[in-house]
């Protein structure tokens, strides 16, 4: 292998060269072997990965840089953020010709670290590693995780933890905040070059900045629709955490819902619920408005407005498609919004587990008794009778065969979900040097729709005693 460096060489004014800093007593904890194979990196030895991600030693062709960007954080503009603890090491060309960033998080201080130490802790590194691969397996666009390295280096957060690094990968880590930085720092003349870079390397099928923005709107709308259908709350939807490629980016205090709570907040630094689950679609639009403002003067204003006007329609169209599939419905009917709304009201009112309900709903047949496994989830089954009868009538109108429908529903309603309690158990074991629980959970999450009876204990509801719904931004 030999890395290439188009970002560093073509956009040198958008980054600063920085060497990764070694960790104290690093240890290789996990390699994502399947993904390494897809990217053509199987020839790199475990020793070389440890040397790179733990000891700060270069891979062939590596030119590490920290990228500069800005961002709106909780509604307020921060004019200079950038990679405060992550480095773009270079880009790997995969066997299929695609190009992938190698991005090392926890690599040490950079010119953009401000008051931070440039490190990541094992806890947050495990959470990012698991979440990125879990979302990928669910079909949600995301950065991916390649290598996890732990260490004996003390890192000070709310308490003393140990440092770690994650080598993550994506076609690009370009963010809304990259455009904002140059727009509002008196360097607007750089934006055409940034647009040109995106068009040449990531959107060659598009003609200009107007088409680029329209595609960013479309991808963002579809991404957030997928989050909503999956019950995934990102937690920190600042514009510096929004991908120009429509990827899930920067896993902090994220969370999947358990019981259906529409205003679920997973970040204890968000007491006002700005980034609550049910606010994500509106925040996506707000963030796109900020991107449009940064592009104004470089992209036709009417084209920007026209693209923004399509956001809600695109999001709702895709979300409706996803939810119909989850309910095993093949065609659209005019009353579908009512069916969905009444379901969500019941789920919220009765605290029913979102994922288990949808999985077990696939056992409903057009005739006969209601599945015992489904009724066991419902604290007041009688309250559900009206909705279940309406649902069964809907199935009868479609005439779908029960077994076929169940197979289709199982293929979109996961049995295995990255619940916070599961992640916490894995983290606690890893902090004691036991990676076996991590390996089991990682493997199960690779195939979330399969039965996998050998991992059955990982498919149970979040325990009632677990109250860890909100998490810290510290990582």
Curated annotation (Swiss-Prot):
For binding Mg(2+), which residues are annotated in this chain's numbering?
Answer: 241, 250
The cofactor required is: Mg(2+); Mn(2+)
Tell me the enzyme class: transferase
Q: Which residues bind ATP?
A: 82, 84-85, 105, 117-118, 168, 175, 250
**Its catalytic activity?**
L-seryl-[protein] + ATP = 3-O-(5'-adenylyl)-L-seryl-[protein] + diphosphate; L-threonyl-[protein] + ATP = 3-O-(5'-adenylyl)-L-threonyl-[protein] + diphosphate; L-tyrosyl-[protein] + ATP = O-(5'-adenylyl)-L-tyrosyl-[protein] + diphosphate; L-histidyl-[protein] + UTP = N(tele)-(5'-uridylyl)-L-histidyl-[protein] + diphosphate
Known InterPro entries for this protein? SelO
So where's the catalytic machinery, residue-wise?
Answer: 240
The answer on whether this UniProt entry bears the keyword Transferase reads yes
Annotated family: Belongs to the SELO family.
Specify the protein name: Protein nucleotidyltransferase YdiU
What taxonomic lineage is listed for the species of origin? Bacteria, Pseudomonadati, Pseudomonadota, Gammaproteobacteria, Aeromonadales
């Amino acid at each position: 292998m030999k890395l290439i460096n188009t970002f560093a060489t073509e956009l040198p004014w958008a980054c600063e060269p920085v060497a990764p800093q070694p960790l104290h007593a690093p240890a290789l904890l996990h390699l994502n072997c399947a993904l390494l194979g897809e990217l053509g990196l199987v020839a790199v030895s475990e020793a070389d990965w440890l040397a790179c991600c733990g000891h700060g030693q270069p891979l062939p062709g590596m030119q590490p840089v920290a990228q500069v960007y800005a961002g709106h954080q909780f509604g307020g503009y921060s004019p200079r953020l950038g990679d405060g603890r992550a480095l773009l090491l270079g880009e790997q060309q995969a066997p299929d010709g695609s190009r992938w960033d190698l991005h090392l998080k926890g690599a040490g201080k950079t010119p953009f670290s401000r008051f931070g130490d440039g490190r990541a802790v094992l806890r947050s590194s495990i959470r990012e590693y698991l979440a990125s691969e879990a979302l990928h397996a669910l079909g949600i666009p995301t950065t991916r995780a390649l290598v996890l390295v732990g260490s004996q280096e003390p890192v000070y957060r709310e308490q003393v933890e140990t440092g770690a690094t994650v080598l993550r990968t994506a076609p690009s880590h370009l963010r809304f905040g990259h455009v904002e930085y140059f727009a509002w720092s008196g360097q607007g003349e750089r934006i055409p070059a940034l647009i040109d870079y995106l068009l040449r390397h990531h959107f060659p099928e598009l003609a200009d900045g107007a088409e680029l923005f329209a595609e960013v709107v479309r991808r963002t709308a579809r991404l957030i629709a997928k989050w909503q259908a999956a019950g995934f709350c990102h937690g920190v939807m600042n514009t510096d955490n929004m991908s120009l490629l429509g990827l899930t980016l920067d896993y902090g205090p994220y969370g999947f819902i358990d019981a259906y709570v529409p205003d679920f907040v997973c970040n204890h630094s968000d007491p006002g619920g700005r980034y609550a689950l049910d606010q994500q679609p509106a925040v996506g639009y707000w963030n796109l408005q900020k991107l449009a403002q940064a592009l104004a003067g470089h992209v036709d204003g009417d084209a920007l407005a026209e693209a923004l006007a399509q956001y809600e329609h695109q999001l709702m169209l895709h979300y409706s498609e996803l939810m119909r599939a989850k309910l095993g419905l093949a065609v659209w009917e005019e009353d579908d919004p009512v069916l969905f709304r009444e379901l969500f009201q019941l789920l919220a009112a009765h605290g029913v587990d979102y994922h288990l309900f949808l999985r077990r709903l696939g056992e409903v047949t057009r005739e006969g008794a209601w599945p015992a496994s489904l009724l066991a989830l419902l604290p007041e089954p009688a309250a559900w009778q009206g909705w279940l009868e309406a649902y069964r009538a809907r199935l009868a109108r479609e005439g779908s065969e029960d077994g076929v429908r169940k197979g289709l529903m199982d293929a979109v309603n996961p049995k295995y979900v990255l619940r916070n309690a599961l992640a916490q158990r894995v983290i606690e074991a890893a902090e004691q040097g036991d990676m076996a629980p991590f390996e089991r959970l990682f493997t199960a999450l690779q195939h979330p729709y399969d039965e996998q009876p050998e991992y059955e204990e990982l498919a149970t509801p979040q325990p009632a005693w677990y109250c860890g719904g909100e998490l810290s931004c510290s990582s």
